[in-house]
Amino acid sequence: MGGLVAPAVAGGDEGAPARPVVLFGLDDVLVYGEPMQVFLRQRLRAASWRWPLLLACLPWLLVRALMSRARLRATLGRLALLGVHEARYQHLVDDFAAGLVRRSRSCSRDGLRALRHCMAAGQRVVVVTACEQRLAQAIFHELGLAEVEVLASNWRDGWSGMRQAQANLGAEKVRLLARHGLQDCVAAYSASLLDVPMWRLAAQAVLVNGTPGCCRRLEQALGHAVTRVAWH
């Protein structure tokens, strides 16, 4: 983490410097894969009665897929959680998070080590993720990191069950950070080129487990060199 530049003094006690902010993604940075998508696929498999409904919705799903991948995922998520309301949902994500963390190969040792190092150094660590808020928080609770700040996608209970209210993707991450008073950071770690808007806030952009081609595209998008790390 050497060579990071501290951000400008921000709000809080007058004259007191703000803690340096470090942003981390979750998917393929701290946890391998996309936990929310794995969870939703498990819910679809767990209730066979949903499959006829899924087949009946295929034409609609194809239309959603043409509109955007994010909309398709939101629709599939709504089908996966049909009839699952808030209390049941919380129980399910708690169980899923516990199982995920028990599988030691599901988490990046190097990523979690870097996150803990930042916290020990007094930096303000914020995890910014497309994963659903309660699921992400449950994962960190199981990791013994319940104090980590999490800014994530928002799902709400409705008459038919849980449904996505706000997807925390791309530029939306920057808007969500701004709503929490965060407009710059000393470093941002991510594995996805969708996070270019978030990387633009960072003095140091760090690409996790990216290919050379991905690294070149990121540098072209940002207009400067980035750091590439290989985490296991």
Where in this protein do the model-derived segments appear?
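Generic secondary-structure boundary/loop-capping signal
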Residues: 23, 78, 162-163
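C-terminal cap/substrate-recognition subdomain and adjoining C-terminal extension
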Residues: 1-13, 17-19, 91, 98-232
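Surface-exposed loop/turn and secondary-structure junction residues enriched for glycine/proline
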Residues: 33, 39, 84, 138, ...
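Active-site neighborhood of HAD-like aspartate-dependent phosphohydrolases
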Residues: 2-68
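A metal-dependent, Asp-based hydrolase signature
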Residues: 33-36, 47-113
